[in-house]
Design a protein with these regions (language model features):
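Short, T/G/N/S-enriched strand-turn elements that build extracellular solenoid repeat scaffolds
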Residues: 1, 14-20, 33-40, 53-60, ...
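Short "repeat-start/strand-capping" segments in structured domains, especially the N-termini
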Residues: 2-6, 21-25, 40-45, 60-65, ...
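GD-rich hexapeptide-repeat beta-solenoids
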Residues: 9-10, 25, 51, 65, ...
Length: 210
């Protein structure tokens, strides 16, 4: 639909077509949601469900993008991106596709798995969880290494960070690694405290800033 903001408040939403708005779009669900088509808004896009989200296609917003669910799976070749991007899984977020945005915040209550073809990008990027796995994967004999990269500053708040086999944590600005994301001098989603365990095995942690 076009020409106005749209709100979909429903138990469930299914289909492999396009759900688009040339302004804002808000979708609230209580069951699992599988996005196999395109979910896009020229303005703000809010997608939340008390169930799980499985994205095998495209979720994008021209302005703010907010996605939240119990568990989120962003498959290889799938894309979640906004001008500012906020993604939260109450339990686990698994990414083999692309997550991108200007200022990007990716959080999960328990675990973030960025695997193989998985890329999590942002201008300023904050990643917060209990366990962060940034790991490689071999499919059909081809090994791919995962990447978490910020064009400006990178903040990672996690108790356990596993950066494995040629996978990369990269910041073109400053990099801060702590035990959680918090607020510093009025700025939110900054790494605070200390991570308990950092396993960096044959992998890269690199900052061109501080």
């Amino acid at each position: 639909s076009a020409g106005q903001s749209n709100t979909i408040d429903s138990k469930s939403l299914t289909g492999d077509g396009k759900v688009t708005s040339n302004q804002d779009l808000s979708i609230s669900l209580i069951t699992d949601y599988a996005n196999t088509g395109e979910l896009t808004a020229d303005g703000k896009l809010t997608l939340n469900t008390t169930g799980n989200i499985n994205n095998t296609s495209k979720i994008s917003a021209g302005s703010d993008l907010n996605v939240s669910a119990q568990n989120i799976d962003n498959a290889a070749n799938a894309e979640i991106n906004g001008n500012t991007t906020s993604i939260h899984a109450n339990d686990t977020l698994t990414n083999r596709g692309l997550i991108d945005g200007g200022d990007t915040v990716v959080t999960a209550g328990n675990t973030i798995n960025n695997i193989g073809t998985g890329r999590i990008y942002g201008n300023n990027l904050s990643v917060g969880t209990t366990i962060l796995n940034n790991i490689d994967e071999t499919i059909n004999g081809v090994n791919k290494a995962a990447t978490i990269a910020a064009r400006e500053d990178l903040d990672i708040g996690a108790q356990t960070i596993n950066n494995i086999e040629h996978s990369s944590l990269i910041s073109l600005g400053d990099m801060r690694i702590g035990g959680a994301l918090g607020s510093v001098s009025g700025t939110n989603n900054i790494a605070v405290g200390k991570a308990a365990v950092i396993n960096n095995n044959s992998a890269t942690i690199e900052s061109t800033g501080d």
